[in-house]
Amino acid sequence: MTATRLSVMTAVLAGLLSTGSVLAQHEGHEGHAGHDQAPAAKTPARVGDAYPFATCPISGKQLGTMGDPVVKVYDGREVRYCCGGCPKKFEKHLQQSLAKLDEKIAADQGPIYPLKTSLVTGKDLPEKPFEFVYGNRLIRLGAEQERAEFAKAPAKYLATLDQAVVGAQGKGYPLKECPVSGEKYGGDMGDPIDLVVAGRLVRVCCKDCKKDVEKDPAKFIGLVDAARKGEKPATHEGHEQHKGQEGHGGKDAGHGHE
């Protein structure tokens, strides 16, 4: 009888120990579950302007024809692609790809560059200034040595460049209405807001419209360029078009006046 009772007690204890071991292992796995899930990668912050062109730098296709553009940021530099397959091709030889993009930006923004002086020193630019692209903006300096000074406060110098663009293009600005909404400047929306995109002044009627320009900068660059050449601008979307989408006064608007 004693032997039987000892056997039963031994079996019960063994069962309890086994159950405790299983529970401990299960808790251990739960504790490690969080470790298996890597934290979501943060999108690098963009510096300067959005990607200014309407086409993919790899395929040459119009952005948006294959769905929403794929956006990548390289050391603060934004590039947009037509599809998910193009970034790998661009990144295979990243420096060469960026250099090619720099050439395109310099060719595009060079003719409308507003300053004849170095952005850093304020001295007259030489016949062949030192040029580079920062944050998708063309920068001209008197000499390469000035680039180190620019790097200390790039936001400050970009703001100075923006002011120069507004000063150079503001007086003869070709549009009388906001290119996004079609609202006349200075109406119920108040004073217009001056944006600088890829070296162009883009004047909008309100803060809501800034986000539309940010979403598709090439579209509005094209509208301003066409108007400057005397061409009739394309039909604007209008504020009513944005109601219920992104904005202008809609009840479920994604953004409103700040």
Range-by-range predicted roles:
Residues 1-10:
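Bacterial N-terminal signal peptides that target proteins for export
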Residues 6, 15-258:
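Intrinsically disordered, low-complexity terminal tails/loops enriched in metal-binding residues
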